[in-house]
Regions:
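Retroelement reverse transcriptase polymerase core
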Residues: 1-172
Length: 172
């Protein structure tokens, strides 16, 4: 609750269980099992980029920067009328998400649509985006800083935060 991602809820129509999933780092991640909700949601078929095409698009570029959005899905606010559909039960009470949680059927497509709109002027030209992973690319070393400035201006405009521990700048 301190992060502002969830709020307490009473008498929700939907209620999911919490499951703990062990991360590669050995830490545990709390996840909500949205199986029942996902069954009744229509599928959003928004396409994800093909990894092989993204890799091919880096050919001929001298510098690359890899960036990762900080808790990417959690940076998207849920519509007020949809928040209670994400209700889950804990030993402390019932809560729902105010932001898009991991585990929703259409979260990945929703996020990809958002970043495609955000970076539409850059994708294919000097940037590629796969869900919450961003790749900034420059054919000349001298232009890389300008491309990063353009990218950071867009991130600032949409108030998107990065995870600095997962960002790698100026890879040759």
């Amino acid at each position: 609750m301190a992060a502002g991602f969830i709020r307490e809820v009473y008498y929700p129509e939907w209620l999911a269980n919490v499951v703990l999933v062990k991360k590669a780092s050995g830490k545990w991640r709390m996840c909500v099992d949205f199986t029942n909700l996902n069954k009744v949601c229509p599928k959003d078929s928004f396409p994800l980029p093909r990894i092989d095409q993204l890799m091919d698009s880096t050919a001929g570029h001298k510098l690359l920067t890899f960036m990762d959005a900080f808790s990417g899905y959690n940076q998207i606010r849920m519509a007020k009328e949809d928040q209670e559909k994400t209700a889950f039960i804990t030993s402390q009470g019932l809560y729902c998400y105010k932001v898009m949680p991991f585990g929703l059927k259409n979260a990945r497509a929703t996020y990809q649509r958002l970043v495609n709109k955000m970076f539409g002027q850059q994708i294919g030209r000097n940037m590629e985006v796969y869900v919450d992973d961003m790749l900034v690319k420059s054919k000349e070393e001298l232009t890389h800083l300008d491309v990063l400035k353009e990218t950071f201006a867009t991130l600032k405009k949409y108030q998107m935060r990065l995870n600095p521990s997962k960002c790698i700048f100026r890879v040759a």
